[in-house]
Amino acid sequence: PQCTGFALFFDDISGEGTNPVKQTELLNRLTKDFVKSKGDVAYLTVCPTDYSKLWANPTPQGSLAIYGETLDPSIEVFWTGDVVCSDLTPETLDWVNSRIKRPAYFWWNYPVTDYVRNIILQGPVYGLNTSLDSNDLCGIASNPMEHGEASKLALYGVADYTWNIAAYNPIDNWERGLGELMPKAREAYRTFAIHSCDTETGYRRDESWETKTFRIGDWNETEAQALWAEFDKVEKAPAEIEKGCTNKGLMSELTPWLQEFGKLGTRGKRSLELARVYRDGKDDADFWNKYIRNLMSKKDREDYEAHKSGTMKLQPFYENAMDDMAYGFLTRLSGETPICYRGIGSFHNAKTTLSKLMFDHDTTTYYTSGIAQKAGDWIGV
């Protein structure tokens, strides 16, 4: 039986080690003199220097084409897709397989968060094409977070996908996974998980898809009541999870995020209560006192930035609501329109509250698009 396997990684290096000819010579020698001579060793796996289409040389002189021409057919080749963190698609596999002349071994950089360590990904596993088979890829490796227990929700999805690719359903799998990981506090865990999915930058994920938020100027009482109920669930979820979670390792990993999640629920509820006072417009002093009470202090923001959730809808609702009410209140008091700076641009996250970091008077914070600029991109104020 093949009980041992080895992999060589030529990713993220420079110098002579990037030479694909020397790489294949080494790999072929190891295959001949070690793997095949031993007999009980699994096929080698290699991560090429050109592991992503983002920078891979597409020509016949590129390393992938050299792999295809000279690398022992038994050796499996890692591939991350069109970019470092990307979906598994027939198109990206066609591109790489035609060069390496074998089905690629897909290295899926999810749920890894080494580029956003202040986020813990608990959303559904999607972005994996369900029409693929062994002619398209030889396997899939999921790169987990540094949080082993919290990674299990995503790994449950990847395992389910590999078990039956054609029948895989991301939402059905996610719903089952929540119950498997936290059966005694499933609903509270679901409340946290559905609002802890997106990365804000890089490999974007859908989040809070069951929650409708709005601007204060578009107030609708029915929607406001529904949003208050959701923030109430958010506020209560940490205590319910702590009470029902029997996995101490998972609880330990989630706790810093749950603490901030509960605070997010509290300030969301207060924002809606404050909005009613604001809309009533009868007691300016009461409004302003409650407004000041609901502002996040510097410490509050530091704590939230360190362990973020609700980044796509919940926290933006709070930020926008507080800004809209302050703007409207000052306009009402002074009779003049205040000057308000806002970030604009072609980047998707320029439209989010991340752009406020341009104007927070803190030299240690900044806005970043999170992606490389290309022709036609712009950012402005």
Model-derived features: where do they sit?
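C-terminal functional modules
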Residues: 167-338
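Short, conserved phosphate-binding/catalytic loop or strand-edge motifs used
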Residues: 6-13
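Catalytic-core regions of glycoside hydrolase
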Residues: 13-175
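Short, Φ-rich (hydrophobic/aromatic) sequence segments
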Residues: 153-164, 266-269, 377-381
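Disordered, acidic Ser/Thr/Pro-rich linker "stalks" and the adjacent N-terminal cap
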Residues: 331-381
